[in-house]
From Swiss-Prot:
GO terms for cellular component: cytoplasm. This is tRNA(Met) cytidine acetate ligase. GO terms for biological process: tRNA modification. Belongs to the TmcAL family. Its EC number is 6.3.4.-. GO terms for molecular function: ATP binding; ligase activity, forming carbon-nitrogen bonds; tRNA binding. It comes from Clostridium botulinum (strain Langeland / NCTC 10281 / Type F).
Amino acid sequence: MNVSAIVVEYNPMHNGHLYHIEKTKKLTNCDALVCIMSGNFVQRGFPSILDKWTKANMAISNGVDLVIELPTLYSLSSAEFFSFGAVSILDSLNIINSICFGSEIGNINALQDIATTLLEEPLEYKILLKNYLDKGISFAKARNLALVELNRDNKIMSENISKILSLSNNILGIEYLKSLLLLNSSIKPFTITREGADYKDENLHEEYSSASSIRKYLKENKNINILKDFLPLEGFLEFKRLITKGYNFSMEDSMINYIRYKYISGYKNLHNLIDVSEGLDNRIYKSLEKNFTYDSLVGEIKSKRYAYSRIGRILCQYFIGFENYDLNSLLKSTPNYMRVLASNERGLKVLKEVKKHSSINIYTKLPKNTNTLLSLDIKATNAYSLLNNNIRFNEDYFRSPTIIKNTIY
């Protein structure tokens, strides 16, 4: 069985994601497609606009065969750990033949070359990186500058690296490749050229609009019909059904009062989070005292050293309660389970193959005794239930995977 995989967030699913699914199937000629998906919180530091079960069902309705949850620890981590969490789970299944991701460059060889350098870290690169970090530059920017300078004698390569590393999907793709190399994985990587608007673009465009633009529209408007051209048909119909039922979309602003209350109540333990360097915790506390919206709060805290998405992830982690866990140890380990959110009949065949070839624990219902990684997911869903009145406290214990039969794909 030729099984391919994709790593997704679907916040929310749009036409660009459908294009990714269709191109992956064509490029890899796979018999089945597995996706590992962020749950109720996503990597840019936002609550997901739709809950993880609704997102998973949409994925199955649009051509995915099996949806696995990416543990929240990884979905709210840097690109490096986000990628490692996803790839390590896929690798441990022992049945995934290929992985396909979107990138702005669409050239797997160029991305592989950079990934190899970053993983091997030659001495000159390490020295350059340290010099830039000592100047107070963010890690991502310092890494880019170090790579460019490392290739300064090759002007064409240097210019290409600078361009490649300025674009988010290229960066994420490099991290997937690094993880595959680190794990010595047999999974073959493919990349497709990303189509459509940049993820930061908040304006709706014909055919391929960004998830950011769709979230902004849903936040500010009631007429869902405008989005018909920007969403897969099944996704659009699901949005209409949810709105009719009174579903409330989870937005980042809805977290702020809870975060401010936690701080006011004396929970000043941000320093326990691994992304919080010395002094950043006090910077955040001061900003919490006077900012009442997500954008104003993050906007005041961010700097050339602290990127917007990093601050957003810290706020989500604080909201959930990550600071009470030994995150360093968790991130150094590999997950020993996969949590199934949804499947079709072909996906059930994939699960049978996993059982034959892997010792990984497969969870369709939560076990009585949960490990730390899984307990963080439960905690995340409970925090998410404060933002989305369609999700109950301890919803993870009530939900089983949706099995969708006779899908057209």
